[in-house]
């Protein structure tokens, strides 16, 4: 009887390799621990941290190739971008940048990686095929973030000090095509897939501002009251520092860095409407979504953790400890792992 059960178990594991103990992780969250030297890797099916990838001191940004075969990490201390093979978690290439690299983004065709160079006010453009910086673009003082929505024709980069977001045509020699001016220093940004709306976090604002890209003009601000002093994060150094569009472009989620929550807005009408706030860990300063939009993940810098949130139920499901001062994070589905499912 025992032999029969063992044989049946073996058959099940062979027919479904995803059940095997050593099966590749099919859904993985990479978390950049900005005050440390590592990326934390979380198995999203098991909802637990499984390993630490040593990457270099002060990893800043993360971006993934369209096919999820490579994740790119900017490392401030080395002034470099590292290419990580997601099937093996090995660094397969390193490209030196022209200065201190901040957040980066990949063009939808996978050909180019743009990196905001904070100390020079530029954006480096890496040719992924040649693995080198092929062009450097003017952005403005304290260049900080780059962003390209899925299927878009442009890349966007921010200058904190100039209060601007610049739009570049990556298919036309990376030409500057628009500059959008805001009324305060610009932090993170996100753009709808149709490139109609641009949303930004601004210093001093507990909420967000938005612009219409057809005109290149800021349309307004949306602000939520600050929490009472006793409920504010002691770690947070600004009101918000992270925002992202839930897949489907119907909801905008904004971190309440100071209020330990994720603020949700309905953007299907103008002006956007506040919906609710989901409580997460201390000082959430970045967030991202699963590709299907079912889950949100916040990086809680004050708690050295991430929170998994059920987007439809507006409920935090689990906190998972990671490294020191987590910030950027990215869900990845390694191609080899997908092939085994």
Give a label for each model feature.
Residues 1-7:
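Bacterial N-terminal signal peptides that target proteins for export
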Residues 10-341:
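Predominantly soluble domains enriched in secretory-pathway, periplasmic, or organellar proteins
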């Amino acid at each position: 009887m025992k032999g029969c059960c063992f044989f049946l178990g073996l058959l099940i594991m062979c027919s479904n390799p995803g059940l095997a103990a050593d099966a590749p992780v099919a859904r993985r969250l990479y978390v950049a621990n900005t005050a440390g030297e590592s990326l934390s890797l979380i198995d999203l099916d098991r909802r637990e941290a499984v390993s630490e990838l040593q990457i270099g001191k002060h990893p800043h940004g993360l971006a993934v190739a369209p096919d999820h075969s490579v994740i790119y990490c900017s490392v401030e201390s080395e002034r470099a971008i590292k290419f990580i093979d997601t099937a093996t978690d090995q660094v397969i290439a390193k490209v030196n940048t022209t200065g201190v690299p901040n957040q980066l983004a990949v063009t939808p065709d996978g050909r180019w990686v743009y990196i905001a160079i904070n100390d020079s006010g530029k954006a480096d453009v890496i040719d992924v095929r040649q693995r080198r910086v092929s062009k450097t673009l003017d952005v403005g003082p304290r260049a900080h973030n780059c962003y390209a929505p899925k299927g878009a024709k442009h890349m966007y980069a921010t200058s904190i000090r100039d209060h601007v977001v610049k739009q570049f045509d990556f298919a036309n020699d990376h030409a500057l095509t628009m500059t959008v001016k805001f009324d305060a220093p610009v932090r993170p940004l996100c753009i709808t897939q149709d490139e109609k709306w641009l949303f930004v976090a601004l210093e001093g604002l507990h909420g967000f501002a938005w612009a219409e890209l057809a005109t290149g003009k800021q349309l307004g601000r949306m602000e939520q009251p600050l929490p009472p002093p006793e409920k504010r994060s002691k770690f947070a150094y600004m009101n918000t520092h992270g925002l992202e569009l839930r897949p489907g472009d119907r909801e905008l989620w904004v971190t309440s860095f100071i209020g330990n929550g994720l603020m949700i807005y309905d953007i299907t009408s103008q002006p956007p409407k506040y919906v609710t706030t989901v409580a997460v860990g201390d000082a959430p300063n970045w967030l991202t979504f699963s590709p299907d939009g079912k889950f949100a993940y916040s990086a809680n810098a004050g708690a050295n953790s991430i929170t998994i949130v059920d987007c439809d139920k507006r409920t935090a499901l689990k906190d998972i400890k990671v490294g020191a001062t987590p910030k950027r994070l990215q869900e990845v589905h390694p191609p080899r792992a997908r092939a085994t499912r």
